[in-house]
Amino acid sequence: MLIPKRVKYRRQHRPHRSGVSKGGNRVTFGDYGLQALEPTYITNRQIESARIAINRHMKRGGKVWINIFPDRPLTQKPLGVRMGSGKGPVEKWVANVKPGRILFEASYPNEEVALEALRRAGNKLPCKVRIVKKEDQF
């Protein structure tokens, strides 16, 4: 699972989900990318699930890059606890994703296999995504 090794403050405010991605919206490493179309939080479990889906479909011939990292903690108080008494414990780690952000990149010799692998990864994510090619964006 992807979580930070150490953080200065264990509990943070919730990040804003509005606006568009300022950076990380071009395919740089691979030949194909998975681009978010909606603002959302993506948990470390969802990132891992999508990564496994890509790797299982592409097998050995390809390479995958994960361009997001879950660096923001989300806290939640236990069920049945009254209001007050401080902020709850960290429940999960999330990546704050805004529209336009490239989430995953892949390269594979066969284009159909790479696109199908990214499509399967998109089904594991909580937002609408589209597949972009490196040569189409310039």
Curated annotation (Swiss-Prot):
GO biological process terms, semicolon-separated: translation
Output the HAMAP family linked to this UniProt entry.
Answer: Ribosomal_uL16
Q: Basic residues: which segments have biased composition?
A: 1-19
Pfam families cross-referenced by the UniProt entry: Ribosomal_L16
Protein name, UniProt field: Large ribosomal subunit protein uL16
Location of the region described as Disordered in the Swiss-Prot/TrEMBL record: 1-24
Which keywords does this Swiss-Prot/TrEMBL entry list? Ribonucleoprotein, Ribosomal protein, RNA-binding, rRNA-binding, tRNA-binding
Name the NCBIfam families for this protein. rplP_bact
Q: What does this protein do, in the record's words?
A: Binds 23S rRNA and is also seen to make contacts with the A and possibly P site tRNAs.
Database matches in InterPro entries: Ribosomal_uL16, Ribosomal_uL16_bact-type, Ribosomal_uL16_CS, Ribosomal_uL16_dom, Ribosomal_uL16_sf
Q: Quaternary arrangement and interactors, per the entry?
A: Part of the 50S ribosomal subunit.
Keyword Ribonucleoprotein among record annotations = yes
